[in-house]
Amino acid sequence: GRKMKKYVKRLEAIMLGITMLFSMPFSGTAMAAGKTSANQMTVKTHTAQTTAVEDAESPKTTFPVHVIHKTGNDKENFVIVIMGDGYTAQQQDQFVKDATQKAQGMLTWSPYKEYSDRINIYAIQTISNETGISEYGGKSVDSYFHLRLFGKAIGFSNGGDQKAKDLREEMEKKYLDAGASVGTIHILSNTNGDFGASINSLFSFSTNSEDNSSGTAMTHEVSHSIGGLGDEYERYTNKPNTSATSD
């Protein structure tokens, strides 16, 4: 039934996140712990060119949907949806360009590159009234998802998460191939500040910063969401070291 389908889909996501998304060898302990570093396991490979599919008509969806990368049926492939925040109606062409550039960049990293034929990527052209991002205790921007900066992290405010969930449901019911579901959502904030976050398996965030111009930050944050990975930084050691060289 529906519950079993969701369970199978989650297993597929875990397989992508743990056994497919990380091509370097693991120790048995690292595999069991599921705490591998997103920094550590994302390995750059030679550049591959992604062929974008022509936009499909989406008259039944609230916002236009742009097909960035589709290689097979949505039910069989892992579906990534990119949504914009802080992009006004006049900036939608820029959003599509930004989302496409970052998604194509992500598909040049292993093992996304090797499994690119099992991944479909779409962009939903959500429209904000104002450009930019709000700051906790500071400026307020009227953006669609009401994203807000909390120090170096990004999060929802004022019900923005429910808006994203509603758009996911709409995609699943009215746009994707029959029986398909969205695997994860990445929200791209129209600000040049260098921020990012992943709050669970469904949502991750990055910005339109120079460091993220080729999707490096997006790849990092999406890997947190799909693989359930923890950071391993010399300056940030609250996660256990689970590298292949650790005891």
State the predicted function of each range.
Residues 4-15:
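Bacterial N-terminal signal peptides that target proteins for export
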Residues 24-26, 89, 192-201:
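Short, surface-exposed beta-strand/loop "edge" segments at domain boundaries and coil↔beta transitions
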Residues 179-193:
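Short, well-ordered secondary-structure micro-motifs within conserved domains or adaptor modules
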Residues 37-177, 191, 209:
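Propeptide-to-catalytic entry region of secreted or membrane-anchored zinc metalloproteases
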